[in-house]
């Protein structure tokens, strides 16, 4: 209380960034194996902000049909074209990727662990297909971070594709201490772009 008072009276974009924000972002980046991280009030807010800020009419978002509702809502805010593939159907995903080669960015959008059924994304196969078609991979790992992988880093660790997933979102409200908050974790370039948007 002596150092920080009772807390910020609003979000950091209004009241400013404190050293504890950056410290947590650095620790999350180190844990997740990414270059940088940006904190949000919740993962729902992270998912709401990521697509609109990064993608335009020149791009396409290709989502697993069972992604979390917050991802669907976030995609709707973006001007990017939107498409879906049958749940965990890699042949259908490949058809979709091949059909959108005219787009600037092709982004495969998935959960790491699907919250309704508890099944895992076939992330190793998704990443391989994305690399074949020069596409990006977005994973909401809210239900995997802290649980999946040898050291709890999430579905990208579990499937052996750490460093090959372009954008991770997640929550601090589950395995990571039960606090509130969410994050986007990615390359330094992507996170700096998001900070400026």
Regions of interest found by a model, annotated:
Residues 3-42:
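Conserved N-terminal alpha-helix of the aminotransferase class I/II PLP-enzyme fold
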Residues 50-69:
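Conserved PLP-anchoring active-site segment centered on the Schiff-base-forming lysine
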Residues 57, 77-79, 133, 164:
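Short, structured coil segments at secondary-structure junctions
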Residues 66, 113, 141-143:
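Conserved Walker B
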Residues 83, 87-139:
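Active-site phosphate-binding strand-loop segment of PLP-dependent enzymes
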Residues 133-136, 143, 148-197:
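Active-site C-terminal subdomain of aminotransferase-like
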